[in-house]
Curated annotation (Swiss-Prot):
Stored CDD domains: AdoMet_MTases
Presence of the UniProt keyword Methyltransferase in the record: yes
Source organism of the structure: Escherichia coli O9:H4 (strain HS)
Compartment(s) of residence: Cytoplasm
Pfam families: MTS
GO function term, MF aspect, one: nucleic acid binding
Name of this chain's protein: Ribosomal RNA large subunit methyltransferase G
Length: 378
């Protein structure tokens, strides 16, 4: 846990999933402080929109103003809810909208934590363009190193005149005034042909490796199991290419596509509808934090390309949680397959959780691992 003192309220905040005490990661950053410094209670008039509030620092601080929190992370929503409870703030103080929803009209203040991907930022700025006015105060913040010329140019192109502040604690802010500059329409998704198939893959803005198949997934697809039956999971499904391949290779199986990103789940659904519509009755689509709330002993197999970062931080906490959830939800003798960068040493982590692990394939960068849920371990 960490403490954030600001002009609105003193907060105790924690990350979600929680980090260990040996290598703790903070649930807020200097950009959050800097953004809050720019606001004074007397000048907040009209609805407050907060975009990409990773762990709820901004939403908790401004809870009295009933803000709307918008993002493409269900984990961020869970983190915000947890931090509201931790600080004794009514959860209903913050309204949550996912990245595919329409934004509230005529907001008084918009606070943006600049996301990692320029594509997501553009999608969000285009959505804001439909609802903000020239009186809306628009402020964005990030680490100074993450604000580039291309970032400022995007604000200028979509919304209007843009300036940036001096750096403070290695953070920088962007101030923007809406004047409705001319702007050509842009598609909601990008699409590309998946080599070796007849499939066209469609990706929403925040999907990993948006413009082509990432090399880890490419390697994983060469080693996916065949002839499985029952329910299997594409955990952290992204655009769903792994799940699509599983549907194709396992015609007797049902595939559950799971991701914490609403855009990822929407992309997966679109890709099944476009490329294998006849298999839709063998699919389930779920926005979730790994397999939280899913009943134990449900699945015959789980397949996963786990992330090793959360927001801008490198961490294996999300992967570790995925592995534990997979073990709980697998049937006895159910199998977990993962692909990962070799340097992450997931072999020993999986062996610690499951009691066994086998290397299926390896190259100079990636490894495909398999582990089995044995009945003797609880």
């Amino acid at each position: 846990m960490s403490h954030l003192d600001n002009g609105f309220r003193s907060l105790t905040l924690q990350r979600f999933p929680a980090t260990d005490d040996v290598n703790p990661l903070q649930a807020w950053e200097a950009a959050d402080e800097y953004l809050l410094q720019q606001l004074d209670d007397t000048e907040i008039r009209g609805p407050v929109l907060i975009l990409n509030d990773a762990f709820g620092a901004l939403s908790c601080a401004l809870a009295e103003h009933k803000p709307y929190s918008i993002g493409d992370s269900y984990i961020s929503e869970l983190a915000t809810r947890e931090n509201l409870r931790l600080n004794g703030i009514d959860e209903s103080s913050v309204k949550f909208l996912d990245s595919t929803a329409d934004y509230l009209q005529q907001p008084g203040v918009v606070l943006i934590k600049v996301p990692k991907t320029l594509a997501l930022l553009e999608q969000q700025l285009r959505a804001l363009r439909k609802v903000v006015t020239s009186d809306t105060r628009i402020i964005a913040g990030a680490k100074a190193r993450d604000i580039h010329t291309s970032t400022l140019e995007l604000f200028e192109k979509v919304l209007g005149p843009t300036t940036t502040t001096l750096a403070w604690k290695k953070a920088r802010l962007i101030n923007c005034t809406f004047n409705e500059p001319p702007l050509a329409d842009a598609p909601q998704t990008v699409s590309w042909k998946l080599e070796g198939t007849d499939w066209t893959i469609h990706n929403h803005a925040n999907v990993f490796s948006r413009t082509g198949l990432d090399i880890g997934a490419r390697f994983f697809m060469q080693h996916l199991p065949e002839n499985l039956e029952g329910e299997i999971v594409d955990l952290g499904c992204g655009n769903g290419v792994i799940g699509l391949t599983l549907l194709d290779k396992n015609p007797q199986a049902k595939v559950v596509f799971v991701d914490e990103s609403p855009m990822a789940v929407a992309s997966s659904r679109m890709n099944v509808e476009t490329n294998m519509p006849e298999a839709l009755d063998r699919c389930e689509f779920m926005i979730n934090n790994a397999l939280s709330g899913v009943e134990p002993f449900r699945f015959n197999a789980v397949l996963c390309n786990p992330p090793f970062h959360q927001q801008h931080a490198l961490t294996d906490n999300v992967a570790w949680e995925m592995f534990h959830h997979a073990r709980r939800c697998l049937k006895i003798n159910g199998e977990l397959y993962i692909v990962a960068n070799r340097h992450l040493d997931y072999f020993h982590k999986l062996k610690k959780i499951f009691g066994n692990c086998t290397t299926i394939a390896t190259n100079n960068k990636f490894v495909v691992l398999k582990t089995v849920k044995l009945g003797r371990r609880r």
